[in-house]
Regions:
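Cyclophilin-like peptidyl-prolyl cis-trans isomerases
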Residues: 3-208
Length: 208
Protein backbone atom coordinates (compact mmCIF):
# COMPACT_ATOMS: atom_id res chain seq x y z
CA UNK A 1 0.00 0.00 0.00
CA UNK A 2 1.35 3.45 -0.88
CA UNK A 3 -0.54 5.33 1.82
CA UNK A 4 0.98 6.14 5.18
CA UNK A 5 -0.62 5.74 8.57
CA UNK A 6 -3.12 8.41 9.53
CA UNK A 7 -1.09 8.97 12.70
CA UNK A 8 2.15 9.86 10.90
CA UNK A 9 2.90 13.56 10.47
CA UNK A 10 6.65 13.75 9.85
CA UNK A 11 8.24 15.63 6.96
CA UNK A 12 9.58 12.32 5.66
CA UNK A 13 6.14 10.70 5.68
CA UNK A 14 3.49 13.26 4.78
CA UNK A 15 -0.08 12.37 5.60
CA UNK A 16 -2.24 11.25 2.70
CA UNK A 17 -5.97 10.84 2.10
CA UNK A 18 -6.32 7.14 2.75
CA UNK A 19 -8.81 4.93 0.97
CA UNK A 20 -9.02 1.20 1.59
CA UNK A 21 -11.58 0.47 -1.12
CA UNK A 22 -11.57 -3.22 -2.03
CA UNK A 23 -10.59 -4.32 -5.51
CA UNK A 24 -14.23 -5.20 -6.06
CA UNK A 25 -16.07 -6.75 -8.96
CA UNK A 26 -17.34 -4.08 -11.38
CA UNK A 27 -20.01 -6.37 -12.80
CA UNK A 28 -23.68 -5.76 -12.23
CA UNK A 29 -25.60 -3.59 -14.67
CA UNK A 30 -28.83 -3.27 -12.72
CA UNK A 31 -29.12 -0.87 -9.78
CA UNK A 32 -31.15 -2.52 -7.05
CA UNK A 33 -31.83 0.38 -4.68
CA UNK A 34 -33.96 -1.71 -2.29
CA UNK A 35 -30.73 -3.60 -1.60
CA UNK A 36 -28.99 -1.80 1.30
CA UNK A 37 -25.63 -2.50 -0.35
CA UNK A 38 -26.51 -1.01 -3.74
CA UNK A 39 -23.98 1.81 -3.40
CA UNK A 40 -21.14 -0.70 -3.21
CA UNK A 41 -22.15 -2.70 -6.30
CA UNK A 42 -22.28 -0.26 -9.19
CA UNK A 43 -20.96 -0.59 -12.71
CA UNK A 44 -18.39 1.92 -13.92
CA UNK A 45 -19.97 4.46 -16.27
CA UNK A 46 -18.71 5.10 -19.77
CA UNK A 47 -16.70 8.27 -20.23
CA UNK A 48 -18.93 11.24 -20.98
CA UNK A 49 -18.24 13.80 -23.70
CA UNK A 50 -17.69 17.36 -22.50
CA UNK A 51 -17.58 20.61 -24.43
CA UNK A 52 -14.43 22.71 -24.03
CA UNK A 53 -14.90 25.13 -21.16
CA UNK A 54 -18.17 23.55 -20.10
CA UNK A 55 -19.16 24.58 -16.57
CA UNK A 56 -20.39 21.85 -14.28
CA UNK A 57 -21.14 22.68 -10.66
CA UNK A 58 -21.23 20.10 -7.89
CA UNK A 59 -23.25 21.21 -4.89
CA UNK A 60 -22.89 19.54 -1.51
CA UNK A 61 -25.53 20.33 1.09
CA UNK A 62 -24.21 19.31 4.51
CA UNK A 63 -25.46 19.55 8.06
CA UNK A 64 -23.04 22.43 8.68
CA UNK A 65 -23.67 24.36 5.44
CA UNK A 66 -23.43 24.18 1.67
CA UNK A 67 -20.50 24.12 -0.74
CA UNK A 68 -20.24 24.47 -4.49
CA UNK A 69 -17.37 23.18 -6.59
CA UNK A 70 -16.58 23.84 -10.22
CA UNK A 71 -15.70 20.47 -11.72
CA UNK A 72 -12.75 20.17 -14.11
CA UNK A 73 -13.65 17.85 -17.02
CA UNK A 74 -10.83 19.22 -19.19
CA UNK A 75 -8.33 17.91 -16.63
CA UNK A 76 -10.10 14.90 -15.14
CA UNK A 77 -12.90 13.72 -17.46
CA UNK A 78 -13.30 10.26 -15.90
CA UNK A 79 -13.45 11.67 -12.39
CA UNK A 80 -16.05 14.22 -13.42
CA UNK A 81 -18.00 11.51 -15.28
CA UNK A 82 -18.02 9.31 -12.19
CA UNK A 83 -18.99 12.21 -9.92
CA UNK A 84 -21.95 13.13 -12.12
CA UNK A 85 -23.01 9.50 -12.43
CA UNK A 86 -22.85 8.79 -8.70
CA UNK A 87 -24.49 12.09 -7.80
CA UNK A 88 -27.41 11.51 -10.13
CA UNK A 89 -27.93 8.08 -8.55
CA UNK A 90 -28.09 9.62 -5.07
CA UNK A 91 -24.88 7.85 -4.07
CA UNK A 92 -23.47 10.72 -2.03
CA UNK A 93 -26.71 11.52 -0.19
CA UNK A 94 -26.54 10.64 3.53
CA UNK A 95 -22.82 9.88 3.36
CA UNK A 96 -20.53 11.28 6.05
CA UNK A 97 -17.15 12.95 6.16
CA UNK A 98 -15.49 10.10 8.03
CA UNK A 99 -12.04 11.67 8.36
CA UNK A 100 -11.33 15.36 8.99
CA UNK A 101 -7.78 16.35 9.87
CA UNK A 102 -7.42 19.95 11.04
CA UNK A 103 -4.76 21.74 9.03
CA UNK A 104 -5.00 19.20 6.22
CA UNK A 105 -8.30 18.03 4.69
CA UNK A 106 -11.84 16.63 5.03
CA UNK A 107 -12.46 13.20 3.47
CA UNK A 108 -15.82 11.69 2.55
CA UNK A 109 -17.55 9.67 -0.13
CA UNK A 110 -17.39 6.23 1.48
CA UNK A 111 -20.85 4.61 1.51
CA UNK A 112 -19.73 2.52 4.50
CA UNK A 113 -18.61 5.59 6.42
CA UNK A 114 -15.37 4.01 7.68
CA UNK A 115 -12.88 4.69 4.89
CA UNK A 116 -13.01 1.20 3.39
CA UNK A 117 -15.88 1.46 0.92
CA UNK A 118 -16.38 2.45 -2.67
CA UNK A 119 -18.85 2.26 -5.56
CA UNK A 120 -17.86 -1.22 -6.76
CA UNK A 121 -15.46 -0.04 -9.46
CA UNK A 122 -11.96 1.45 -9.56
CA UNK A 123 -10.19 3.57 -12.16
CA UNK A 124 -6.91 5.36 -12.86
CA UNK A 125 -5.79 8.78 -11.73
CA UNK A 126 -5.76 11.71 -14.16
CA UNK A 127 -2.90 14.16 -13.72
CA UNK A 128 -1.97 17.50 -15.25
CA UNK A 129 0.76 20.08 -14.61
CA UNK A 130 -2.10 22.60 -14.56
CA UNK A 131 -3.65 20.93 -11.50
CA UNK A 132 -1.55 21.29 -8.37
CA UNK A 133 -2.48 20.97 -4.70
CA UNK A 134 -1.41 24.56 -4.12
CA UNK A 135 -4.30 26.09 -2.16
CA UNK A 136 -7.28 25.41 0.09
CA UNK A 137 -10.64 24.41 -1.37
CA UNK A 138 -9.45 21.87 -3.91
CA UNK A 139 -11.48 18.74 -4.58
CA UNK A 140 -9.25 15.70 -5.01
CA UNK A 141 -9.67 11.94 -5.08
CA UNK A 142 -8.50 9.63 -2.31
CA UNK A 143 -6.90 6.32 -3.23
CA UNK A 144 -4.65 3.55 -1.96
CA UNK A 145 -2.27 3.56 -4.88
CA UNK A 146 -2.37 3.72 -8.69
CA UNK A 147 -5.58 2.50 -10.29
CA UNK A 148 -7.65 2.58 -7.09
CA UNK A 149 -9.69 5.78 -7.46
CA UNK A 150 -13.37 5.27 -6.65
CA UNK A 151 -15.81 7.50 -4.78
CA UNK A 152 -13.84 8.76 -1.79
CA UNK A 153 -12.76 12.38 -2.17
CA UNK A 154 -11.18 15.05 -0.03
CA UNK A 155 -11.28 18.83 0.27
CA UNK A 156 -8.04 20.60 1.12
CA UNK A 157 -7.79 23.09 3.99
CA UNK A 158 -4.23 24.14 3.05
CA UNK A 159 -1.76 23.63 0.18
CA UNK A 160 -0.69 19.96 0.06
CA UNK A 161 2.01 19.79 -2.64
CA UNK A 162 3.22 16.31 -1.62
CA UNK A 163 -0.04 14.96 -3.09
CA UNK A 164 0.68 16.26 -6.61
CA UNK A 165 0.60 13.51 -9.27
CA UNK A 166 -0.60 11.01 -6.65
CA UNK A 167 -4.17 12.26 -6.17
CA UNK A 168 -6.37 13.63 -8.96
CA UNK A 169 -7.72 17.17 -8.62
CA UNK A 170 -11.14 17.26 -10.25
CA UNK A 171 -12.77 20.38 -8.83
CA UNK A 172 -12.28 23.69 -7.03
CA UNK A 173 -14.40 25.53 -4.47
CA UNK A 174 -16.41 28.47 -5.78
CA UNK A 175 -18.62 29.05 -2.72
CA UNK A 176 -18.82 27.79 0.84
CA UNK A 177 -15.56 28.84 2.51
CA UNK A 178 -17.42 29.21 5.78
CA UNK A 179 -18.66 25.62 5.49
CA UNK A 180 -15.13 24.34 4.95
CA UNK A 181 -14.05 26.29 8.04
CA UNK A 182 -16.84 24.62 10.02
CA UNK A 183 -15.72 21.20 8.83
CA UNK A 184 -12.15 21.89 9.85
CA UNK A 185 -13.16 23.12 13.31
CA UNK A 186 -14.95 19.82 13.88
CA UNK A 187 -11.94 17.77 12.89
CA UNK A 188 -8.87 16.75 14.86
CA UNK A 189 -5.25 15.79 14.41
CA UNK A 190 -6.24 12.12 14.39
CA UNK A 191 -9.04 12.63 11.86
CA UNK A 192 -11.85 11.82 14.29
CA UNK A 193 -14.69 14.34 14.11
CA UNK A 194 -16.29 15.97 17.14
CA UNK A 195 -19.74 15.37 15.67
CA UNK A 196 -21.33 13.60 12.72
CA UNK A 197 -20.62 15.54 9.52
CA UNK A 198 -23.19 14.54 6.92
CA UNK A 199 -23.64 15.17 3.21
CA UNK A 200 -27.41 15.59 3.24
CA UNK A 201 -27.67 15.90 -0.52
CA UNK A 202 -25.37 16.19 -3.52
CA UNK A 203 -26.53 17.63 -6.84
CA UNK A 204 -25.29 18.72 -10.24
CA UNK A 205 -26.48 22.26 -10.90
CA UNK A 206 -25.18 22.73 -14.42
CA UNK A 207 -24.31 19.73 -16.54
CA UNK A 208 -24.34 18.83 -20.22
Amino acid sequence: MLMVSTSVYSEASKEQPLSDEPMGDTAGVNIDKPNPDWKSNLQQPELMSFKPGQEIIWKLETNVGDMKFKLLPDIAPMHVTSTIYLTNLGFYDDVIFHRVISGFMAQGGDPLGIGQGGPGYLYDGEFSPEARHDRPGLLSMANRGPGTDGSQFFITFVPTPWLDDKHTIFGELISGKETIAKLERRGSRSGKTSERLLIVRASIEEAM
